[in-house]
């Protein structure tokens, strides 16, 4: 056997983070805060153009947009984060629908999925680019903006009628009416839950900024032999600290997105343990 004893979960987690970081750095061509011009051509070629740092200044024009209107690489990364939100939250409601498949309550979960799809487009329009994802957008004769709003409306009605179903549609509607404020705020919460995933982009942006700052501080000292040792120490300390902060941020934000956004859409609550100080 390669390992005589099982690997500690912490090491497996750190290893997974490390491999994921290397993969993401390869796809986006971000290596220790270095500019693409400082990297070899073969490393640049491994990246995906639409999210690559190599094409940071490129304007990506879509088939339905006029000349001069398009998406930047940063906006493409934001779309990636919001798409990840759509996928994960949709999975939560699919699990809920399967759990309630023998009840009409399943229609409430389907309605929530429709709301997610519609609000996803609203987020792209309001947060990413209103010109590319306009409410008046028509693609192949399909009014995308109108369809998005219709999905939100249909999904809201389905959730309003069936979300509290326990054997009676009338009682389910009355329950929704009693909690009408919470029901209406639920639509806003869906919007905020999707937007919340932009924290993933922000964390990556902060890490890249720290790396670039460390490089700028150390680069003037690399040309002087007397200060080279200090430059090496600064680079090791700065990038090492950045890695530690990134590990913590990934754990913190990952836990939040799973225990709050994902769990709330899964209709799962965390009970925890009662805090009893001074008790052994």
Description of each model-found segment:
Residues 1-280:
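Conserved, carboxylate-rich catalytic/transport cores that coordinate ions
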């Amino acid at each position: 056997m390669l390992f005589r004893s099982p690997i500690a979960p912490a090491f497996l987690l750190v290893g997974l983070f490390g491999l994921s970081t290397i993969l993401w750095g390869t796809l986006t061509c971000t290596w220790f805060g270095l500019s693409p011009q400082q990297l070899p051509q073969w490393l640049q070629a491994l990246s995906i153009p639409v999210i690559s740092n190599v094409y940071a200044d490129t304007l990506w024009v879509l088939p339905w947009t006029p000349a001069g209107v398009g998406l930047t690489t940063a906006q493409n990364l934001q779309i990636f984060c919001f798409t990840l939100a759509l996928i994960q939250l949709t999975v939560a409601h699919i699990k809920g629908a399967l759990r309630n498949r023998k009840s009409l309550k399943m229609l409430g979960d389907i309605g929530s999925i429709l709301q997610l799809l519609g609000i996803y487009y609203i987020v792209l329009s309001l947060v990413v680019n209103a010109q590319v994802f306009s409410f008046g957008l028509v693609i192949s004769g399909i009014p995308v903006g109108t369809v998005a709003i219709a999905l939100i409306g249909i999904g809201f009605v389905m959730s309003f009628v069936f979300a509290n179903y326990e054997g009676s549609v009338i009682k389910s509607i009355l329950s929704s009416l009693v909690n009408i404020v919470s029901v209406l705020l639920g639509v806003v919460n869906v919007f905020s839950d999707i937007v919340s995933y932009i924290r993933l982009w922000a964390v990556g942006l902060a890490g890249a900024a720290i790396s670039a700052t460390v490089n700028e501080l150390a680069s003037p000292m690399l040309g002087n032999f007397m200060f080279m040792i200090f430059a090496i120490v600064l680079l090791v300390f700065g990038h090492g600290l950045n890695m530690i902060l990134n590990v913590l941020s990934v754990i913190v934000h990952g836990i939040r997105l799973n225990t709050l956004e994902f769990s709330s859409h899964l209709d799962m609550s965390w009970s925890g343990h009662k805090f009893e100080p001074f008790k052994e």
